Amino acid sequence: MVRNLRSSEPQKISRFPRHHGEGKKASSPALNLQWPGQKQVASAVAPEMRKRAPPKNNNTSIHRNCRKHLRKEGDWWIVEGGQNHKKAAHSPLKTKPVNKEGNRKKYGRPPREVEGKWLTSLIAATTEAVLRQLGKGKSPTAHTKSNQSRVPLQHSEKTAKGIKYATPQPKKKAHEQRKELPHWPPTKRSHGANKGQGAPVRAPAKTQGKGEEQPHTMRTWAQVAAPKKQKVTSKPPMAQKKKAQGEKKGAAANPFHWELQVEQLLKDAEQIRESMYIRFLHVRQSWWSTCFKAHMEFHCPVCGFAHPEETITVTHCRQQHPGGPPDSLHPDNNRESGAVSQVPPAHFRRWWLSSHIWRKRKISTLLSPKLPVPEQGDYPNARSGIGTGAPHSPHHCDRSAGPP
């Protein structure tokens, strides 16, 4: 920091400086580095340009020699030179005491040690003042006591004459005031607020940060429907088992619940089996009533069925034996024909069950390759082979009887 040694009084600067007395030698002319009308500024580089004009009246005015030098020592700027104030000889003036270091003045910032102590003391004093204000229940920017005691009431409590102020409350203790301190700094009063009244209390501004938002407690439907995730811990299985034993009784799975489910499934399977057997009996009953006639008489002596697809076979048989005995089967004959022996009775039972479960198969696709058209010589054998009782296959049940 450089000291500005600007002269306090304006002076005339000419090309040739004035003499301060007779017998004195005139100094060499100095360069005029200023514009006309500009004040002269002192400089540590050109001290000869800082000479002041002599006083107008030769009285007790002081003649000063302003030849001073400016140098820097570390963090200090030191100005040296110059003389003390002197008066005329007839009235001596008491001189001022000189500093121990001589006529030297220091400018600039103090040393680092002193600066550190000064900052520490300043911080400590400020902290102490703030804590003292907080202890009294006031913030550093709070209003005065007179303004705090005159708190205006709500708009509904204002009277016609003017504002009705609340009565000042008695002072509370220090620990009670600390509990009532706000968690946010008080807002500054606006410029348009009335100075005689306290500023209105404002709510703190809402921050936009995510950390300040309050989490909602309601769950979404996706969270409700989602299954609970099992907690995966790093503890050994024995420790988890001990922890599970100490839980509530309702937390463990009920084994009787699963046993009840199994019994229910078995019951359903049994009902399905019974219903299927009942359907089987209904189909067999309708087949018997359709195919059987009194005295063991059937439509066809070869197959014994009355199906529309077998009309060709029946017509062929009757054409081959126009004058033969009526188409009747007798159970007292155990002989089998070659055509019927290809399909044993057990196979007929399987076809009968499968055809009435799916209701998709037809007798033409099952029996046509296995039962060839009977010839004239095979007719007696066919009658005796089928005459073992009731037929063993329900493929040619009457469609008019309806579903079982």
UniProtKB/Swiss-Prot annotation:
Keywords: DNA-binding, Metal-binding, Transposable element, Zinc, Zinc-finger. GO terms for molecular function: DNA binding; zinc ion binding. Residues 1-11, 29-41, 141-151 have a biased composition (Polar residues). Residues 98-111, 395-404 have a biased composition (Basic and acidic residues). A zinc finger (C2H2-type) spans 300-321. Residues 1-62, 86-111, 134-251, 317-341, 369-404 are annotated as: Disordered. Transmembrane segments: none annotated. This is Retrotransposable element SLACS 45 kDa protein. It comes from Trypanosoma brucei gambiense.
